[in-house]
Amino acid sequence: MLNGNEWHQLHGDFLSDTQHLMGRADECLSHLELISDDKDAVECLLGTLQQIAGKSDAAHVQAIASFARQLRYLLYFAGAAGRLQPKALISLRQCLSLLSWQIELVDPLTGQLPLDDTEQQHLLEQFGCCCGIGQVESSPAVPVEWPVPITSVHSDAALGERAERSSAL
């Protein structure tokens, strides 16, 4: 943990660097909104989130480092699976907006972010659900529109049929 004087010296660089990186992340996301399967835009966003996490680690702002890493993790799998549909991109934009806002809220004197991670976790779960990655069991349900009606009866034949449909997707 940095003391107040060390953090104060580091704060200007941290804020400037992360704001620049957030601008780049916004450009990458805007490109993804135009061309949702653009691998270069996904790679740019993944690299940018990794740099934000690294800068946050160096500045000892763990809440932001952790959020950037978790978002990168979900984005990596969603991009690899080709699941960055419009709803997922809207959710991703919400995550990036929160990240940007939290960077602005880091206390310039102490380097602390005086917030809990409830909203971060909610948005990460929402993004994961929009990408088809799933949600954490302890979280409240997030509405998802399924392309096929879900039945509550689980017969062996129905499970086999669902497995065949899943592998076809």
Q: Where in the sequence are the language-model features?
A:
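Non-catalytic helical tethers at domain boundaries
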Residues: 1-169
